[in-house]
Amino acid sequence: MAKIYTDKDASLEPLRGKTIAVIGYGIQGRAQALNLRDSGLKVIVGLRKGGNSWNVAASEGFEVYEVGEAVSRADVVMVLIPDMEQPKVWQSQIAPHLREGAVVDFAHGFNIHYGLIKPPKNVDVVMVAPKAPGRAVREEFLAGRGVPALVAVHQNYSGSALKYALAIAKGIGATRAGVIETTFAEETETDLIGEQTVLVGGLMELIKRGFEVLVEMGYQPEVAYFEVLNEAKLIMDLIWQRGIYGMLNGVSDTAKYGGLTVGPKIIDEEVKSKMKAAALRVKSGEFAKEWVEEYARGSPNLKRLMESVKEHPIEKVGAEMRKLLFG
């Protein structure tokens, strides 16, 4: 059974009087920095000199330093730059300036789990991973709520690493919603598997294939778009709010019967076995190796694949339909 922490299980006291350096001021970095400051904690920001985010962070009242300087001033270092940029920045600007006993926080376990970043033994290494985009992290905090998060400890030098992680989670508002204790391995692997087989890869391909079938059968592309893509949000909202069974009780009996009898024939045991094979590639590290090598080459395959999606007929029809819907 998962261990879930809420506001009553966490305290901001471990962070009182300490300096927190947020490295990166993108959507997630900005949200977490603002939330922590609004929680009464001292936050500075570490950025590349001359980057676009420097002036933004400064205009919002933060002391901004180059990354190495921010790290040298910090008791807590939150690494909130993109995954694939982290190893280089870590090696050149973070690791040389870390204080003994510092707390290093990540929002995703990829680089630690796959050994691309290897922290020294004399620091705590934790993860607080909000399960929502940065915009929601900020908006929910301002509304007096929070988004759920995962929390993990990779290295417990101080003996209090979990307390620090929970304090960070409380500071960004996550304990208001609930924080699940996990491991770097579990967070990383489930995140990648979920993205590839369901949330990004699986859902995207299911929608594209459904659109292709309807158009190839002679139905109007505009009608096909609404049926397989636009209405997907309505169904996902129901699932998010009520669960799968609750969603079924929110649609017609015809939709229920058709979905329950035909769905398993489409997403069958063969599909499940392919999903498991993809999951095993993640677990073995094969996917991470492939992606790191692809990124090092300048991501040519990713760029080609992105272009193919951009040119898919559903995108051309969708652009017109979204103009009708959203102006």
UniProtKB/Swiss-Prot annotation:
Mg(2+) 2 binds at residues 191, 227, 231. It catalyses: (2R)-2,3-dihydroxy-3-methylbutanoate + NADP(+) = (2S)-2-acetolactate + NADPH + H(+); (2R,3R)-2,3-dihydroxy-3-methylpentanoate + NADP(+) = (S)-2-ethyl-2-hydroxy-3-oxobutanoate + NADPH + H(+). Residues 183-327 form the KARI C-terminal knotted domain. Pfam families: KARI_C, KARI_N. Its EC number is 1.1.1.86. The active site is at residue 108. Substrate binds at residue 252. Coiled coil: none annotated. It is an enzyme of class 1 (oxidoreductase). Mg(2+) 1 binds at residues 191, 195. One of its GO terms (biological process) is L-valine biosynthetic process. Its cofactor is Mg(2+). Residues 2-182 form the KARI N-terminal Rossmann domain. GO terms for molecular function: ketol-acid reductoisomerase activity; magnesium ion binding; NADP binding. NADP(+) binds at residues 25-28, 48, 53, 83-86, 134. It comes from the Archaea. Pathway: Amino-acid biosynthesis; L-isoleucine biosynthesis; L-isoleucine from 2-oxobutanoate: step 2/4; Amino-acid biosynthesis; L-valine biosynthesis; L-valine from pyruvate: step 2/4. SUPFAM superfamilies: 6-phosphogluconate dehydrogenase C-terminal domain-like, NAD(P)-binding Rossmann-fold domains. Belongs to the ketol-acid reductoisomerase family. NCBIfam families: ilvC, PRK05479.1. Involved in the biosynthesis of branched-chain amino acids (BCAA). Catalyzes an alkyl-migration followed by a ketol-acid reduction of (S)-2-acetolactate (S2AL) to yield (R)-2,3-dihydroxy-isovalerate. In the isomerase reaction, S2AL is rearranged via a Mg-dependent methyl migration to produce 3-hydroxy-3-methyl-2-ketobutyrate (HMKB). In the reductase reaction, this 2-ketoacid undergoes a metal-dependent reduction by NADPH to yield (R)-2,3-dihydroxy-isovalerate. This is Ketol-acid reductoisomerase (NADP(+)). It comes from Pyrobaculum neutrophilum (strain DSM 2338 / JCM 9278 / NBRC 100436 / V24Sta) (Thermoproteus neutrophilus).
